């Protein structure tokens, strides 16, 4: 089995190398994602899977209260506030659905971009692009089209894990921008559904410890630098939690939240 996998890897790596720059990889990833999104939209319909998502949309858009409101209970207040501002700026658009679909497609584009950056041969790029698209379609197309905030949070968290884990191949030279992508995706997962974020943390811890092990004891400076990412992430999580608690700090909201938890 290992011999066959090694043979396959050798075949993929063989051939003329085409090292693309960041702009070309980003353009290719965005183009594939846009074409994929347009194709599935032309063939299928996007639907709200859960009543909770429909409820949040109506609150954010102002249908429920008469004016757009960010108190949607299920997702953290700072992110809900951002969506509410979109409804205030351009009413009449389904911004909740657009944002949820956009996050799914953004995660796909980032995964494609990372694959294009890692693999240098045409065969490698084409093979793994095909693998990613086939795997995404088989495992996630239904979840993407019939979306809910929980599955979108899971997609953001999974993309963060992939981005961080694949970045360990060049841990010493990873840019601040690459680390920022990991932080933003993981933070987004928390803002959408904190329980999903917490479930992903053990896997993130394993990847973190693996990266530390790859650096070794001799490179203590780089080891200390690896602590910046989790520190920044949990500062953002802590700040978001404080803002969320402040938004729901009244006794009336505490009672409503208790009823929601009991449900």
What are these regions (language model features)?
Residues 198, 222-263:
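Juxtamembrane membrane-water interface segments immediately following transmembrane helices
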Residues 1-39, 123, 212, 220-233:
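Start-transfer (signal-anchor) and selected internal transmembrane alpha helices
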Residues 130-156, 187, 191:
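Aromatic- and kink-enriched transmembrane "portal" helix at the membrane-lumen/periplasm boundary
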Residues 177-194, 205, 234-238:
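Membrane-interface alpha helices of multi-pass inner-membrane proteins
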Residues 194-211:
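Transmembrane-embedded, aromatic-rich helix segments that form part
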Residues 41-60, 68-81, 90-94:
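Extracytoplasmic catalytic/substrate-binding loops of multi-pass membrane glycan-assembly enzymes
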Residues 123-130, 162-187, 224-225:
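Short hydrophobic alpha-helices at membrane interfaces in multi-pass membrane enzymes
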Residues 102-120:
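Transmembrane-helix motifs of polytopic, lipid-linked glycan transferases
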């Amino acid at each position: 089995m290992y011999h066959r996998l090694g043979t396959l890897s050798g075949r993929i790596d063989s051939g003329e190398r085409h090292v693309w720059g960041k702009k070309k990889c980003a353009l290719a990833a965005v183009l594939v994602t846009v074409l994929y999104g347009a194709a599935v939209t032309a063939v299928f319909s996007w639907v709200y899977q859960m009543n909770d998502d429909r409820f949040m949309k109506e609150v954010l858009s102002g249908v429920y209260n008469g004016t757009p409101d960010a108190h949607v209970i299920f997702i953290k207040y700072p992110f809900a506030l951002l969506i509410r501002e979109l409804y205030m700026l351009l009413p009449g658009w389904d911004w909740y659905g657009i944002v949820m679909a956009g996050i799914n497609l953004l995660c796909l584009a980032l995964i494609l971009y990372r694959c294009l950056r890692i693999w240098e041969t045409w065969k490698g790029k084409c093979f793994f692009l095909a693998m990613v698209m086939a795997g995404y379609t088989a495992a996630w197309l239904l979840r993407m089209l019939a979306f809910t905030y929980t599955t979108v949070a899971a997609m953001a968290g999974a993309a963060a894990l992939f981005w961080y884990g694949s970045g360990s191949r060049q841990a010493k030279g990873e840019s601040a921008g690459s680390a920022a992508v990991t932080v933003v995706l993981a933070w987004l997962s928390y803002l959408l559904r904190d329980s999903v974020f917490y479930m992903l943390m053990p896997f993130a811890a394993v990847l973190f410890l693996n990266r530390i092990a790859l650096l070794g004891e001799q490179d203590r400076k780089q080891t200390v630098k690896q602590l910046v990412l989790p520190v920044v992430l949990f500062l953002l999580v802590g700040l978001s939690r404080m803002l969320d608690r402040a938004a729901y700090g009244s006794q009336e909201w505490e009672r409503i939240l208790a009823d929601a938890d009991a449900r």
